Amino acid sequence: MIYFVRIWLSNGDNLHDKVFHFKKNFPEDATEQEIDEYFQDTYQNLYNAFFSIYEPPKDGGNYCGWKYISQSEYEMLI
C-alpha cells in the first residue's frame, strides 16, 4: 500500500516555512496505527530539527502539522 503525506513547518514569520511531501510503500499487512506512527515519527524528527534552527513562534501558535494527501495531489506538487 502506498501512502502520500504532506508535512508543513513554520515558526509563523513566513520567512522560513518548509513543506515536505513523502511517498512511502508499506507492506500489505501494515496496520493504520503502524502507518500513522511512522509518519508521526517522521513529522516529529523534522519538527525537532526545524526548531533547533529557527525560533519558535513568538505568538505561541502552532503552524506545523501533517496530513495524508492523494496521489494526484502528490504528483502535482513534486
Predicted regions and their residues:
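N-terminal acidic leader/helix
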Residues: 2-29
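Short, mixed-charge low-complexity intrinsically disordered segments
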Residues: 37-78
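Low-complexity, intrinsically disordered short peptide segments enriched in small/polar/basic residues
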Residues: 2-4, 16, 32, 50, ...
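Short, conserved charged micro-motifs
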Residues: 29-35
